[in-house]
Design a protein with these regions (language model features):
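RNA-contacting regions in translation and RNA-metabolism proteins
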Residues: 1-189
Length: 189
């Protein structure tokens, strides 16, 4: 078989079985939207939880589609994940297993700290950094523009390392001005 440079690229990933239905959506609506917007085809193997994204048009749009699928797999609502089709938006997935010993309750504790009482901590970080955060399985994931994600990740790392919530809030409130200035400079350049 010839190796043609124009050959369509296929990206594969494993998605938790319970999230496959969300990727498909009601009457296939989510899958169809991702395929159309991402100029790709999506094949889902429900037995193995494998998802294949085949580039059909613009390779950057197909990569964005793969990030959308990954985000939905990491617990994001599809409407939130669609923001990854926006230029300069990214998904960062932080695995919590790296900071917790196997078999410990540390992951559960960290997830509780990130979410906060009735979702308060997550909401405050999202509001102050203009990002979206999902806590799912053994991961914490963030969607936002490059600048915003940087600040959200810093705040999350502070929480994960054991800093008090109020310390993280105070840090973020101090950094909000820096964040706005960085975004302004990014938009001007």
């Amino acid at each position: 078989m010839d190796n043609d440079d124009n050959e369509n690229q296929i990206i594969s990933m494993k998605i938790p079985l319970e999230r496959l239905g969300v990727i498909i959506g009601k009457e296939g609506s989510v899958k169809k939207y991702i395929e159309e917007t991402g100029q790709c085809g999506i094949i889902i193997d429900s037995e193995t939880s494998d998802v294949f994204i085949e580039q059909k048009g613009d390779p950057l749009k197909a990569l964005a589609a793969a990030e959308v699928v990954k985000a939905v797999g990491r617990g994001f609502n599809p409407d939130r994940a669609y923001s990854l089709f926006t230029e300069n938006y990214q998904l960062i997935v932080m695995p919590l297993r790296e900071v917790a010993r196997k078999g410990s309750n540390r992951i559960k504790d960290i997830k509780g700290r990130v979410i906060g009482r009735e979702g308060k901590t997550r909401r405050i970080i999202e509001d102050l950094t203009d990002t979206m955060i999902s806590v799912y399985g053994d991961t914490v994931s963030v969607i936002g523009d490059y600048v915003s994600v940087k600040y959200a990740i810093e705040a999350l790392q502070m929480l994960i390392s054991g800093k008090k919530q109020r310390t993280v809030y105070a840090y973020l409130e101090e950094r909000v001005r820096d964040l706005k200035m960085e975004k302004l400079n990014e938009n001007l350049s």
